[in-house]
């Protein structure tokens, strides 16, 4: 009988296997970009999924984190049964200098222009 | 009876309607990124579709140019029956300073790393 536990092996591309196309695709979704912006504000820290107060279902949230992980944008690790997430900034900056910062700046500029704010963070 | 002529009205977002998500999505596809890289090397010039020697069918090529146009990455205009394409660099740079340059630099770095070259240009 299967259990409700997720598979314990989480696939991540090695730094040299990260590709620009999947990274841009991962960042092109507004919900995923929100996640990345929130993580970038807490540099180096790890966040559980529930940290991000996202206007989507849990399964959609899981999907978005998987896209971010499989593209190489973030790293997910288990701490007990919780997945913790951290931005792979060192890998991205080494491969694509300035790219992540310019995307974050563009997102900030657009949010200012449109009067959007990052959602309040969960507990 | 319909003719083979494409509709003559080509929709473009105004500068203020260009959004980061669709721009990143447009740039996330390898073929579209090739087109943008080739155009960026000829700053300000206009190119016909046939300029780009792309390994895709004509209808796929048309699709890619439409995605680039509708996201605001390039402008398409008719000159006679030919569509000419130009990068909307001024609009993109005004909205998202440094973004296009960092994506182009990232694409160059990746191509160098993987030993890829831009395709030979058509006639």
Model-inferred region functions:
Chain A
Residues 1-2, 80:
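N-terminal cationic amphipathic segment used for targeting or macromolecule association
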Residues 2-19, 37-41, 89-123:
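Amphipathic alpha-helical dimerization/coiled-coil segments
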Residues 5-9, 25, 34, 38-41, ...:
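N-proximal short alpha-helices
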Residues 21-57, 79-91:
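N-terminal helix-turn-helix DNA-binding core of bacterial DNA-binding proteins
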Residues 29, 64, 97:
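Conserved acidic functional residues
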Residues 50-74:
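Canonical helix-turn-helix DNA-binding module
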Residues 74, 85, 107:
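A short beta-strand-loop micro-motif that forms or neighbors metal/cofactor-
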